[in-house]
Amino acid sequence: MSSITAKLVKDLRDKTGAGMMDCKKALAETSGDISKAVEWLRQKGIASAEKKSGRVAAEGAIGSYIHTGSRVGVLIELNCETDFVARGELFQGLLRDVSMQVAACPNVEYVAVDDIPKDIVDKEKNIEMGRDDLAGKPEQIKTKIVEGRIGKRLKELALIEQPFIRDSSITVEQLVKQVAGQIGENVKVRRFTRYTLGEGIEVEESDFAAEVASMSS
């Protein structure tokens, strides 16, 4: 098996535009054969997805999903570069998949970690810094532990960081990149809204014992 060097990874990345981790995995899967690694990335729909990510995606579609029982609903905007692609089967399939993903993730509030407001990040940091299990630890160690916990917590809030519900071996971000590679355009999840039936409505709690008593009187 060939040694996978940093230069080999860089060469593959330059050829395909794929991410560093994807290039490393491709080379590992193909025993360091760069030609086969390019084919592997193309089969996965990853090759050139990174290069496309800088292009303007102003077209697309707004999708909706209503979960069984009509208790959860989702609206989502998915962007691409051309109206032709937006009407295509691959793009529409991705739109459905990501809509279902949002419905299945009640704790997700943002598209990406970078979208999370600074005040939310600071609030999470303050909560973690005040944990009892960190009391007495050196400041440097405490900071490192908190950074790890915060990173994990912020990923829980970001849609593209979630394991894909139909294939937990990839994230939503990787799924989007795969489809972008397959259709040859930049694809982005722009925004979404998740609705839960009765959310935010205060329901008056009834006195069950009193109800039973009144029925028997």
Swiss-Prot record:
User: Which InterPro entries does the record match to this protein?
Assistant: EF-Ts_dimer_sf, Transl_elong_EFTs/EF1B, Transl_elong_EFTs/EF1B_dimer, Transl_elong_Ts_CS, UBA-like_sf
Question: What is a single molecular function from GO for this protein?
Answer: translation elongation factor activity
The superkingdom of the source organism is Bacteria
In terms of Pfam families, this protein maps to: EF_TS (PF00889)
- List locations, semicolon-separated: Cytoplasm
Q: Name one GO cellular component term.
A: cytoplasm
Assign the protein's first listed, main location to one coarse class. cytoplasm
Entry keywords, A to Z: Cytoplasm, Elongation factor, Protein biosynthesis
Span-the-membrane segments of this chain are: none
Signal peptide start-end: none
Q: Where is this region: Involved in Mg(2+) ion dislocation from EF-Tu?
A: 82-85
**Protein function:** Associates with the EF-Tu.GDP complex and induces the exchange of GDP to GTP. It remains bound to the aminoacyl-tRNA.EF-Tu.GTP complex up to the GTP hydrolysis stage on the ribosome.
Q: Which family does it belong to?
A: Belongs to the EF-Ts family.
What is the protein name given in its UniProt record?
A: Elongation factor Ts
